[in-house]
Every structure is written in structure tokens, then in C-alpha cells.
A protein has these predicted regions:
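A detector of single, family-specific signature residues
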Residues: 1-160
Length: 160
């Protein structure tokens, strides 16, 4: 049974890649996405599956909120104060697809590495840095797809 499921998963992954390869627009966008250090075939396919939502987002902030990586502050007057966390209101599939690319980007992407080092230097914990890296990766993905150009680390992205 497990072998049959593994075969089906492999067949579906190949079908997804073949579908992207057959459409020139999707193939070009996949190339732009995979030019970002940390993004490979599977995460780019997940991002491409959310293109409809991407076209409705006018700003990178909206795109980040769609993924549920925006900040949710729990505060009720002066009585209840909890630590800020990501809202998780958006696409869990997109967040899940960006988890390992963000880990990879913290070592391989110069912009996200400098950003993560700065946050660690400010005393932020590992998961906080990782969520911030996922958010930064979403901003980079937004810029690459909006500008319709491959990733360029020297293209004026602020390291903040």
C-alpha cells in the first residue's frame, strides 16, 4: 500500500512539473522564482498555484498577509498583553512550502542571511528569526514576480 502511495505521489509531482513546463508563462515565472537562493522546484510550484491570489495583491504587505505571516498582536487595553506572533490567518500550504526554503535562505541568500544575523544580534530567538526570514522571502518573491525579472541581490533590496 505504501509503495502504491509513493508511486502516486511521484506521478503527481511529475504531472505538476510537466504542467508548468508546458505553459510558457508558468515556466518563465518558475525560472524567476528559482533564481532566488533557497527556492527550488516544489516551493516554486506551490507559489505558482497561488498566482490568482498574487494578482489580487497590490502590495507585498497584502501578499504576506495572504500567507498568514503578518503580525497579530494580542492586547486588550492594559490588562492582557501577550507576545506578538504571526497571525496564521492565511494559506497554511504557502507557509509550509516556505519553511525549508527560509531555512536554506538564512545560509545561502545574502539578503536574508544579513537580515537573520541582525535579528540574532538583537537577541531574537530561532523561530522568530525563521518566521521573519519567511516573511522577507515573501517580499522577495513578490518583487520578483511583480517586476518580472530574476532575483538580483544588488537590485536595491534593503537589508532591514
Amino acid at each position: 500500500v505504501l509503495d502504491a502511495l509513493d508511486d502516486e505521489i511521484a506521478r503527481l509531482r511529475k504531472a505538476i512539473v510537466d504542467h508548468i513546463d508546458q505553459d510558457p508563462d508558468l515556466r518563465q515565472r518558475r525560472g524567476w522564482l528559482e533564481s532566488i537562493p533557497g527556492i527550488s522546484t516544489r516551493p516554486s510550484a506551490v507559489v505558482l498555484s497561488h498566482l490568482d491570489a498574487f494578482t489580487r495583491c497590490a502590495t507585498a504587505k497584502q501578499w504576506v498577509a495572504y500567507a498568514g505571516l503578518d503580525c497579530a498582536i494580542g492586547q486588550s487595553g492594559t490588562s492582557v498583553r501577550r507576545r506578538a506572533a504571526i497571525s496564521k490567518r492565511g494559506s497554511a500550504q504557502l507557509r509550509r512550502a516556505l519553511y525549508f526554503p527560509a531555512l536554506s535562505a538564512l545560509t545561502n541568500n545574502p539578503i536574508i542571511r544579513a537580515f537573520g544575523d541582525r535579528l540574532k544580534g538583537n537577541g531574537k530567538r530561532g523561530k522568530v528569526v525563521l518566521c521573519a526570514a519567511m516573511r522577507k522571502l515573501m517580499h522577495i518573491i513578490f518583487g520578483v514576480l511583480k517586476n518580472q525579472q530574476p532575483f538580483d541581490p544588488n537590485a536595491g533590496l534593503a537589508v532591514s
